[in-house]
Amino acid sequence: MAAKWEKLEGNVGVLTIEVDAKEVNNSIDAAFKKVVKTINVPGFRKGKMPRPLFEQRFGVESLYQDALDIILPKAYGEAIDEAGIFPVAHPEIDIEKFEKNANLIFTAKVTVKPEVKLGEYKGLAVEKVETTVTDEDVENELKSLQERQAELVVKEEGTVENGDTAVIDFEGFVDGEAFEGGKGENYSLAIGSGTFIPGFEEQVIGLKSGESKDVEVSFPEEYHAAELAGKPATFKVTVHEIKTKELPELNDEFAKEADEAVATLDELKAKLRTNLEEGKKHEAEHKVRDEVVELAAANAEIDIPEAMIDTELDRMVREFEQRLSQQGMNLELYYQFTGTDADKLKEQMKEDAQKRVRINLVLEAIIEAENIEVTEEEVTAEVEKMAEMYGMPVDAIKQALGSVDALAEDLKVRKAVDFLVENAA
């Protein structure tokens, strides 16, 4: 086999590939063995039709497509290795010559990984993040704990206020007609939660238990039910009961209830401070890592092929679909609820996809420029760390990974980011 690579404009080039006639004939033989198994011919058992009779009846040309399916992937794979190129999309194949007893000649128009011209990536100036925890931070965290342990108690007197829970009956009407899904009884509505459409909860504020009111609202233009989107509606609302949050007293008993590991309120405050300090430190480290990577990416010159962005978009959509499934949803339901579609979703994701591709390419270039390597010991240590984290045997982690090559590449990327941070100004 012979291959010649010719660079065209941008990140596109053409591979001209010639495969020896012997391999061509071998692929045609393999195609015959595959096809003949499916043919029934009177006088012969299935799959036993002689080759000369097959070619006489169907023509050797009838085997060419199956033969090409066999020979092309192998020839193309060997050709890209020989040319030393890295395709980022499926090639456009053009068969120039394919026949029995002759060399196969074909071209493959290929989009390849772009050249990355690294800009400044050492000594990058990054903003130092404040990690000090104040008394106010601790008090706010304590208040959040207090809110989470609050109990709802019936409000005997007074009106609905923001933060209360109103137990209501409601029925919605559009153009004087009730609509499906617009009715509820004894519904506990947390006022200020934004659960209902804009303007609804605000109009319940001020009502007393037993009072009724017509609430006038309009459905948002992007509402998931197209027949209601943008339309004005009237909801007949009756308040049955008002509940308000009763916060527990801040004392040692509260502290023990909130965290079994502490005995006093002071101990709880100290633990909250430590947790906040660790959280802020972790957040600051992540911010610096993100910032140096983004700066290095912005400083580089890259002509990113659209095919790489499309591939990343497909990956991002699959990731999004997996997250939806964990919430008991799927893409079709998401499109219905949000009034969007596959094209709009990809358009929303495109900027992030471009950013991801650029960052990945720049980090790969830095790994190469700085000769960043990962040892077998480092990979083993990471596998052991994963085993401990997930509570699984090391062998089970190795089996789940299949190959550790991807893990090794991830570790190289991590090292590249470490390098950027260590060399930042």
UniProtKB/Swiss-Prot annotation:
Keyword Signal part of the UniProt annotation: no
InterPro entries: PPIase_dom_sf, PPIase_FKBP_dom, Trig_fac, Trigger_fac_C, Trigger_fac_C_sf, Trigger_fac_ribosome-bd_bac, Trigger_fac_ribosome-bd_sf, Trigger_fact/SurA_dom_sf
GO molecular function: peptidyl-prolyl cis-trans isomerase activity; protein folding chaperone; ribosome binding
Enzyme class: isomerase
EC number: 5.2.1.8
Primary residence: cytoplasm
Annotated GO CC locations: cytoplasm
PROSITE patterns in alphabetical order: FKBP_PPIASE
Subcellular location(s) of the protein: Cytoplasm
Entry keyword set: Cell cycle, Cell division, Chaperone, Cytoplasm, Isomerase, Rotamase
HAMAP family: Trigger_factor_Tig
Family affiliation: Belongs to the FKBP-type PPIase family. Tig subfamily.
Functional note: Involved in protein export. Acts as a chaperone by maintaining the newly synthesized protein in an open conformation. Functions as a peptidyl-prolyl cis-trans isomerase.
Protein name: Trigger factor
Annotated source species: Bacillus cereus (strain ATCC 10987 / NRS 248)
Lineage: Bacteria, Bacillati, Bacillota, Bacilli, Bacillales
